[in-house]
A protein has these predicted regions:
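Acetyl-CoA-dependent GNAT
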Residues: 2-5, 12-87, 91-104, 151-152
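Conserved GNAT acetyl-CoA-binding A-motif
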Residues: 101-112, 135
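Conserved catalytic core of the tyrosine transesterase superfamily
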Residues: 1-2, 47, 108, 114, ...
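Conserved catalytic-core motifs of GNAT/GCN5-like acyltransferases
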Residues: 36, 112, 125, 130-146
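Residue-level recognition of the GNAT/N-acetyltransferase active site
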Residues: 81, 114-116
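Conserved hydrophobic/aromatic "anchor" residues
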Residues: 29, 63, 84, 123, ...
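Short glycine/proline-centered loop/turn elements that form peptide/ligand docking sites
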Residues: 94, 117-120, 137-142
């Protein structure tokens, strides 16, 4: 008997979510964004911020922020609580975001990934993203960033 995965609820983030998002971001990245930095994207035209919760959890376990301009968009950040990884949270966030971006007229999504982050690379490649460039020594720890492009 096959069981389905968890139910993942996606909703738009608002200013009141900035502290929660900052806490998730801090747990995921050495150079994290604080609530003020995250809040600077919330409610801004051209920015989309989504939160994911595994039902019936009350607190979000992941989020993403994308910014669009013209027919292109950029994934600014995606963070998922470590305890909830590999449960489909990032995939659900990306599916919701790409659907919204498509609906708004975006044709392509760009993002940077640490060359050593194989889980993220695998996820984006599974969605059809391809490497289109590289930013040498992009991260503070000296790693390069691969630039991915995903046709929407």
């Amino acid at each position: 008997m096959r069981t389905s995965g968890p139910v993942i609820e996606i909703r738009a983030a608002c200013a009141a979510d900035a502290s929660t998002m900052a806490a998730i971001h801090a747990a995921c990245f050495a150079k994290s964004w604080d609530a003020a930095e995250i809040g600077s994207f919330l409610g801004v035209p051209g920015c989309l911020a989504l939160l994911a919760s595994i039902s019936p959890a009350q607190a979000p376990q992941g989020f993403l922020i994308v910014r669009s301009a013209g027919d292109e968009a950029e994934l600014l950040t995606l963070a998922v609580d470590q305890a909830c990884r590999r449960l489909g949270v990032a995939s659900a966030l990306l599916a919701a975001a790409t659907g919204a971006l498509r609906g708004a007229g975006s044709k392509r999504l760009f993002l940077e990934v640490d060359e050593g982050n194989s889980a993220a690379r695998d996820l984006y490649q599974s969605l059809g993203a391809v490497v289109v460039g590289r930013r040498p020594r992009y991260y503070e720890h000296g790693a390069d960033a691969d630039i991915f492009s995903l046709a929407l």
